[in-house]
Every structure is written in C-alpha cells, then in structure tokens.
Amino acid sequence: MSVDRKQAQNIASVLSEGLPYIQRFYGKTIVIKYGGAAMCKTSLKEGFARDIALMKLVGMNPVIVHGGGPQIGSELKSAGIKTSFISGFRVTDRKTMKIVRRVLGQEINKEIVGLIKGFGAEAFAMTRYNKNIIRSSKLKLNEGKDLGLVGKVESIQNKEIKKKIDKGVIPVISPLGFNRKGECLNINADLVAGKIASSLKSEILILLTDVEGIQEKKGKLISKINKKEAKVS
C-alpha cells in the first residue's frame, strides 16, 4: 500500500510523538480492557484493532479483555428476554447466560481477533481456555439479593496466556469464569482485566470505556486514588 506525502508526514508525526512511550513499554505486557461505545461503531472498532496491531508491531505485548454489555442487551431484547440490574450487575439466569456465552465467547471474541489479524498482527480467541484461566465463584451482594449466574474472580491461572505472549500472539479474553461445579459465570470485565493485569504483573492497565473515570458517590471525577481509598466489591 502506497502513501502520499501528507499521509507520510502524519505517520512520521505520530511515531515521533509516540517514541518515548514505545521506548518505555518495549517488551512490556499491557492489559487493555475494551468496552463501551468503542465496541459498537465500525470506525472505532477498526481504529482499536489497528492501534493494538501497532502496539504489537513496535514491540509491546498487549492482552485484551473485552466486555459486551450493549451487544448482550440488544440480543436479549431481540429474544424477548427481560433484563434487570442490581448494583450495576446484570441479573443472569440460565436463559440469559446462554446468550451471554454466545455473544461474549463466540461473536465478540472472534470479531476482535479477526479485526486485529486484518491489520497484520497475530491474535487468538482464548474462550476455549477460560475454564482453566478464570476460576470464580458466585458473587453475593451484602443486600442478599440473588444475581443468578454472576461471578467474581477467585484466581487467575495465567499459563495459557503467557504461552501466547511468548509466541508473539495477542490473547483476546472474554469475562467468563467457571466455578468448582463447572458452572459458567458472567463477570464484570473491568474486574477480570484488573485481576489478569495483576497476575501477569502488567506494566500498565488501560480501561477503554465510555465512563470518564473513577468517580466518587456524588459523581465527581477522582484523578488520583491510593489503595486505602479504593474499595473493591
């Protein structure tokens, strides 16, 4: 593919501005949680995939953890299945879980892999390994309300993820965990991304979302937070 003078100048400008970051994160693992509006618009999806491929091209090791709330909501509506939320978590019965597994584990996961490959990087859908990677248990709220098949991460077994990284492949992971009974559980993608980043000792965790950032109870944006101030549900 050829580029004209203006395009070449733009590429040179971007690379020049990005050089300090390329040098800083060369060879480092970076976990990216991908969600929100960026997953719904074609131009944004392609832009995301292009940027991930570029990160790999310049020597970084991106690991993708994706959500899929809007797509799940749309599929549930089409199927005539009512959905509700408690404390921000989608109540997930068995009918809902069937759609959640299909949308997250098959459709979105594979679409992301295909888009990244389209920009010249190698990516792999990790869904088949989720049972061994994300070990979880049912999430219980203090209010005692039943969320159904909603989970929390108990531990991350990162062996398969590291294998892909070592082979130069970008792992693409859906937020589906499994408990000791073998039940599939729907888990908040932000929480999964955080646990995976910690397990891999990721250099940085990036959350791509349409929420401005961490907010206090009244909605005011918090620019800095420490461990004592942070609350984990």
Residue ranges and their predicted role:
Residues M1-S233:
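Nucleotide/pyrophosphate-binding catalytic subdomain
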